[in-house]
């Protein structure tokens, strides 16, 4: 891959996503409580703590779960903050260590009596109690299975990072769908809505076409928006931008433009497949698909409302679309005070 340019222009993904964005009226209360909860565990060193605060994960939940009641929104905030912990810890680990971290998360989620005393296990147990209070049995079973797939793919991501390997597009897409945790976040929609879809719904062709299109839209949009941040940290191999540039031998700008075309395609597949959904699947299946659309548009809106991806220039980037690439960051001295517990 040739040297990167000094800047590139983002695709205008908002213009090709006609879905309606919203925010949750319970956001401030749920966000404050969830942030206090995660902060009480003192998980991060100074730079990561600042990054966590600036990212405003709870604001993302306000957009993508704009229809949730207070208790459900608080639970989603807790989960997204928990995912941030898993992601930040595993990003600096070897494949073996990342798999061990993931296993702590899975075991704490899966088994009521399992506990290794780590902060990660405690965080996961706290979330588990909130989630199980309202989630249906089929939703819980699928959620736990997705937790296992997520952690396996996070471990695979760490192994690829160790070796410096960049996957081809066909191999990368299923990995990204899982290690992004988007499917886990979609699974929370059933919990929020108080529905418990039959497994057969997840085998329906039109349902799956809409489901995967929504997932890929979130993943690809996230990757092009986060590319500058990730390349500055040396973590851009787990990003569709890098994968496409490597496989197609294209420039950063041409790749960004292509992602814009693909995201527009994902939107159309989602909308068309949603319309084709058979009424025989029941109103809950249609409601679920309608609700994951909030993830597609809400993810776009949130990305420009915080400094997570674009730093202090986030409003300017929203206006111009121009991203000025940052230099590589120096590694932070020291590590989280509880790194031995993860």
From Swiss-Prot:
This molecule's function is given as: Terpene cyclase that catalyzes the cyclization of farnesyl diphosphate (FPP) to various sesquiterpenes, including beta-copaene, alpha-cubebene, cadina-1(6),4-diene, gamma-muurolene, delta-cadinene, epizonarene, epicubenol and cubenol. Agr4 is also able to use the monoterpene precursor geranyl diphosphate (GPP) as substrates to synthesize the monoterpene beta-myrcene. Delta-cadinene is the major product of Agr4.
Site features described as Plays a critical role in the stabilization of intermediate cation, chain residue numbers = 84
Source domain of life is Eukaryota
InterPro entries this protein is in? Isoprenoid_synthase_dom_sf, Terpene_cyclase-like_2
**What GO molecular function terms would the record report?**
metal ion binding; myrcene synthase activity
GO BP terms in the entry: isoprenoid biosynthetic process
**Cofactor(s) recorded in Swiss-Prot or TrEMBL:** Mg(2+)
- Give the originating organism: Cyclocybe aegerita
| UniProt-recorded name of the protein | Bifunctional terpene synthase Agr4
As annotated in the record, motif DDXXD motif runs over 87-91
Where does this protein hold Mg(2+) 2? Answer: 87
Question: Which residues of this UniProt protein bind (2E,6E)-farnesyl diphosphate?
Answer: 308-309
In this chain, Mg(2+) 3 is annotated as bound at: 222, 226, 230
Protein family: Belongs to the terpene synthase family.
EC numbers listed for it are 4.2.3.-, 4.2.3.126, 4.2.3.127, 4.2.3.15
Going by the UniProt record, its keywords in alphabetical order are: Lyase, Magnesium, Metal-binding
Q: Name one Pfam family in it.
A: Terpene_syn_C_2
Q: What reaction does this catalyse?
A: (2E,6E)-farnesyl diphosphate = delta-cadinene + diphosphate; (2E,6E)-farnesyl diphosphate = gamma-muurolene + diphosphate; (2E,6E)-farnesyl diphosphate = beta-copaene + diphosphate; (2E)-geranyl diphosphate = beta-myrcene + diphosphate
Q: Which residues bind Mg(2+) 1?
A: 87
Per the record, what about its domains? The DDXXD motif is important for the catalytic activity, presumably through binding to Mg(2+).
